């Protein structure tokens, strides 16, 4: 027959694609449930929003205050007419009221409360400090004297009430709010302070003024302003920083009211720097900040400079500050924007456990390795698997965006859809790559699933309660934010956080959501860069690890080699001892097989499908245990057309040998060739001409028997009519064709049917080398005989290595047998040779009553004095006779004579069986 031709990349990819497509069609509802998960979660978010609206957004405290204007109730206690306005509102409610004509407010300066002024604590006098520095101390002193007014007189009934107040420097200890519709300095019970160079008791006044619809009565107290010169700005910075209540390490709080650096100001130019406390803006840095009372500081120093230039009569009066008109509003808190980062982090990361578990499941069930053994290359596997997960993930993300927008989530609707899609698309690629990368670290799907879900929920929680706090912290270094974003969960969270902030701003104040023009101004450019780089790195790392694991090398061998230690004395001694023992104990037939192997290697013969030369496998000892020598110097040559049977007790090394030959593990030493190809260097080429029937059936439960064979047939480069014919013949040969059995999912097959399908898979495409591990396990006698016939027919054009515990199967199928004990080949030959070599005796089995056991022993001794008892229980005895000492007729005659003296219930006389040979060799080799 022609040499098998390797399937091309496209052929392999097509085979896997069709198999996966069929598999996914059978699991369509699982895929649908996965894709519509975003819909369920978006509905949950809508429900949360509805609950929040009813409890918070629609609360009386979060809307303009009202009172009932209808005295005539309808008896149901409901108010028909309400009157709402500022006069009925609390401080919290006022911000929601309509302000068609916002009232003018006093431009107050913020001064520290008395508890934050060190002089109040030490001396009892409480001046407020104003710091001044600059290049010209003389000019600075002059301007300092012009900062404050020296008297306070005002007529509250005058039409120019605010203008009269503007001649004074009024201040308050109250911080501002997020708007200027109601200034806490005026609307609170706190007094207003007039800052003067000197205070007298007469400077304490009371004022009454109206800001429709409200009227205020405020007490105006005098507070001394202490102007202090400092040599440079460093001293000012140091004094402000150390005196602030939150940062002083000397426990001396001395905050200042204002601070100026006049720099190079002179009569020809006015150049000044003004200090103020940014802390009063609030904790959030991006979307909402409080006002700070800087305008009055600017006006003070400007007036001081004008008076320096033009005299004391020249001033720019700062009459009032005023907000823009606004309509009545209500609290608008969009939950999708508030909890969007953590919520959608969980939503998107939910794909990660699905991908990782799927990959690990294929590895755990050894589905990938069985595909590889039948010719599927790594590149087609990764490409098709990646494409499938990318398609599912993309559908998932698109559905998330569509569902979220359809039900009105502002998180999606307010931000540019192209930016969102690009971000999600890049991240799901990174997520798939990371799943491929970390799948190599797991061997069980359950463990992988648990770890993946910990990663999912842990990333969301850490992002919300740690990472977001650090993002919003003004003091946390930005470079460490970048380092934290290298963790994929945080890079996802940061991108979602940016979307939520832009959506929140749009909902709060009407500014645009995120657009491409905002890309560089936000953190998205940084996040995109991190995701793209990590995606590439993850793909490269995955490729490296997969190549290393495919060649059975240590993943981190390149790190260990420089420090690799020489074999330990224990290891060397162990190997030498075992080698010496094996040389002494090797039989002539085993030695002859070694000579044959050496001759074949020397001649570079390709007539033998399998050639193994001194193949060894040593497993390193653990926990102080010595190394385990699983296969000890095996030499074997199996020509095409031969079925070689491997017999041996459990743990003899048969499985280790098969694993080496199929590429699951790498030999510790020695070499092996399949069709002239070295299994250590050319395993990918070996797979082209190889078929494997594993001990445990490796099948897809939802694929039919026919679909299994179509897939593996395509991997063997069968196409069109040849493929269909090969599949049909394979199904017929193992009795899985008639009655529609071929179109039944393999999950519904019986154990025997699955076994027959596994054999058919191993033989499809006429492989040149086939490994079968107990192929007839679980079959009924009729099916077993039929399967043996199929295997016997297949060996005409292939070299087959078969392991079995059935002596009948070994005798029927195998041209030669090898018995393994303790990692060594004890004997080799065809069944008749082995029985002749290790048999040499007959076995008499006879059953009588227990009281006649001695009579039976006497009878046996009369026939052969060298006979020995090998079995005895409850009247049944077995005796072994040397063939050269007895004749069969003598035994028959002796038993017939014995029947006249006592009752013989049953008896039998047999030649040595293969099982007897196996037991004898196994006992001898142990």
Swiss-Prot record:
One GO cellular component term noted in the UniProt record for this chain? membrane
Which superkingdom is the protein from?
A: Eukaryota
> Which keywords does UniProt give here?
ATP-binding, Membrane, Nucleotide-binding, Transmembrane, Transmembrane helix, Transport
GO molecular function, a single term? ATP binding
Which SUPFAM superfamilies does UniProt cross-reference here? P-loop containing nucleoside triphosphate hydrolases
Q: Please give one Pfam family short name.
A: ABC2_membrane_3
Q: Identify its membrane topology class.
A: Multi-pass membrane protein
Q: Where are the transmembrane segments?
A: 34-54, 336-356, 389-409, 418-438, 451-471, 525-545
Q: Which residues bind ATP?
A: 648-655
Residue ranges of the ABC transporter domain? 610-847
Similarity field:
Belongs to the ABC transporter superfamily. ABCA family. CPR flippase (TC 3.A.1.211) subfamily.
Put simply, this protein is called ABC transporter A family member 6
Gene name, per UniProt, is ABCA6
């Amino acid at each position: 027959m022609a040499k098998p031709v390797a399937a091309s990349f496209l052929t392999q990819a097509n085979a896997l694609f069709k198999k996966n497509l069929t598999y996914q069609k059978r699991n369509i509802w699982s895929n649908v449930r996965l894709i519509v998960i975003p819909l369920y979660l978006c509905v949950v978010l809508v429900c949360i929003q509805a609950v929040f609206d009813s409890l918070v957004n629609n609360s009386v405290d979060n809307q303009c205050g009202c009172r009932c204007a209808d005295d005539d109730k309808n008896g149901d206690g409901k108010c028909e007419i309400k009157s709402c306005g500022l006069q009925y509102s609390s401080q919290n409610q006022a911000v929601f009221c309509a302000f068609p004509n916002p009232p003018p407010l006093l431009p107050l300066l913020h001064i520290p409360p008395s508890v934050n002024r060190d002089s109040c604590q030490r001396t009892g006098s409480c001046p407020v400090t104003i710091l001044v520095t600059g290049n010209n101390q003389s000019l600075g002193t002059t301007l300092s004297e012009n900062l404050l007014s020296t008297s306070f007189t005002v007529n509250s009934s005058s039409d120019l009430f605010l203008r009269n107040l503007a001649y004074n420097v009024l201040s308050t200890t109250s911080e501002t709010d997020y708007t200027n519709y109601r200034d806490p300095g005026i609307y609170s019970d706190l007094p207003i302070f007039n800052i003067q160079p000197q205070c007298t008791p007469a400077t304490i006044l009371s004022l009454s003024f109206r800001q429709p619809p409200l009227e205020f009565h405020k007490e105006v107290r005098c507070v001394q302003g202490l102007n202090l010169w400092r040599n440079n700005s460093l001293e000012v910075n140091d004094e402000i920083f150390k005196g602030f209540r939150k940062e002083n390490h000397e426990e001396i709080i001395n905050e200042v009211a204002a601070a100026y650096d006049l720099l190079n100001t002179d009569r020809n130019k006015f150049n000044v720097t003004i200090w103020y406390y940014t802390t009063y803006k609030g904790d959030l840095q991006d979307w909402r900040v409080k006002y700070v009372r800087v305008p009055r500081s600017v006006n003070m120093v400007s007036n001081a400079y004008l008076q320096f230039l033009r005299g004391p009569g020249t001033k720019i009066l700062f009459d009032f500050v005023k907000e823009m008109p606004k309509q009545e509003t209500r609290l608008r808190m969009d939950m999708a924007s508030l909890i969007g980062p953590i919520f959608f982090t969980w939503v998107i990361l939910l794909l990660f456990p699905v991908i990782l578990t799927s990959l690990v499941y294929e590895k755990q069930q050894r589905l990938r390795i069985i595909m590889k053994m039948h010719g599927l290359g790594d590149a087609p596997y990764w490409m098709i698997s990646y494409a499938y997960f990318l398609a599912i993930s993309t559908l998932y993300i698109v559905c998330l965006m569509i569902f979220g927008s359809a039900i009105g989530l502002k998180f999606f609707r307010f931000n540019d859809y192209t930016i969102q899609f690009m971000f999600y698309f890049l991240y799901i690629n990174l997520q798939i790559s990371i799943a491929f990368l970390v799948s190599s670290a797991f061997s069980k799907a359950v463990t992988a699933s648990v770890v993946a879900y910990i990663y999912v929920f842990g990333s969301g929680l850490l992002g919300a309660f740690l990472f977001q706090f650090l993002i919003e912290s003004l003091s946390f270094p930005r470079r460490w934010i970048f380092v934290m974003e290298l963790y994929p969960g945080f890079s996802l969270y940061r991108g979602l956080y940016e979307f939520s902030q832009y959506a929140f701003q749009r909902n709060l104040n009407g500014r645009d959501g995120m657009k491409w023009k905002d890309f560089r101004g936000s953190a998205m450019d940084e996040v995109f860069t991190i995701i793209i780089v990590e995606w590439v790195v993850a793909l490269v790392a995955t490729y490296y690890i997969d190549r290393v694991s495919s060649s059975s090398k240590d993943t981190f061998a390149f790190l260990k080699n420089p420090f690799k230690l020489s074999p330990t004395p224990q290891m060397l001694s162990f190997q030498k001892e075992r080698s010496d023992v094996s040389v002494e104990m090797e039989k002539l037939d085993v030695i002859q097989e070694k000579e044959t192997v050496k001759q074949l290697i020397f001649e570079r013969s390709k007539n033998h499908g399998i050639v193994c030369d001194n193949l060894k496998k040593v497993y390193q000892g653990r926990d102080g245990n010595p190394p385990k020598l699983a296969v000890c110097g095996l030499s074997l040559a199996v020509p095409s057309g031969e079925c070689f049977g491997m017999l041996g007790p459990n743990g003899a090394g048969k499985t280790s040998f098969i694993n080496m030959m199929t590429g699951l593990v790498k030999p510790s030493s020695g070499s092996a060739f399949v069709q002239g190809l070295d299994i250590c260097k050319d395993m990918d080429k070996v797979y082209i001409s190889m078929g494997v029937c594993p001990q445990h059936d490796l099948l897809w439960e939802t694929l039919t028997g026919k679909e299994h064979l179509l897939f593996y047939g395509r991997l063997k480069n069968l196409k069109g009519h040849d493929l269909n014919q090969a599949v049909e013949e394979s199904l017929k040969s193992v009795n899985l064709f008639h009655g529609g059995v071929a179109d039944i999912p393999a999950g519904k097959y019986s154990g025997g049917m699955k076994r027959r399908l596994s054999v058919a898979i191993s033989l499809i495409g006429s492989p040149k080398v086939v490994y079968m591990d107990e192929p007839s396990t679980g079959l009924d006698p009729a099916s077993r005989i039929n399967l043996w016939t199929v295997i016997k027919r297949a060996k005409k054009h292939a070299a087959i290595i078969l392991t079995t515990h059935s002596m009948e199967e070994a005798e029927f199928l195998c041209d030669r047998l090898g018995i393994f004990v303790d990692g060594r080949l004890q004997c080799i030959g065809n069944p008749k040779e082995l029985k002749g070599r290790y048999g040499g005796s007959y076995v008499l089995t006879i059953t009588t009553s227990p009281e006649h056991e001695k009579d039976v022993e006497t009878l046996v001794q009369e026939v052969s004095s060298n006979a020995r008892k090998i079995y005895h229980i409850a009247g049944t005895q077995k005796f072994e006779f040397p063939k050269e000492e007895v004749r069969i007729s003598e035994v028959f005659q002796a038993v017939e004579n014995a029947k006249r003296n006592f009752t013989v219930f049953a008896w039998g006389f047999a030649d040595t069986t293969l099982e007897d040979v196996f037991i004898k060799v196994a006992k001898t080799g142990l």
